[in-house]
């Protein structure tokens, strides 16, 4: 909660040593002026990042090299990165290389309202995910990026059964992406999106 509600704060923090910090939950929630690069932060010991940039409407700082592999959630197990970028409406960094821990069970509202976000997350580890409900609510990924997500997630190890996934207004292409989506649905996934392009 360190900068939660600090609506005028926008100072550089990239030199901070956060290597022993374990909880960054809602750290910049509603810090609506904050937009600094944090790429040098060592967040490898952080277990909770839920809501970290929730409502940080100007934030588009570089965090592409973060190691989020331990962000699995302690207070709410499995929810370590849920709501992380909710309503962070400027954020659009390439975080496709993040290592997602297989103990993460939820992408709940992770990018809900992050209306600028448009990256390919098809390479993310979704092994443990049992809900991605409202993950991209209000968001439109490009057809290429959304198609790559569907193809990558279907090809990787994933839960079957009633996994809820909201792709926002994103549309998928015919062919491999449509087939991947149909396969996930046949396995029990409940997918909401903008349909085939």
Language-model segments: residues:
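Negatively charged
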Residues: 1-197
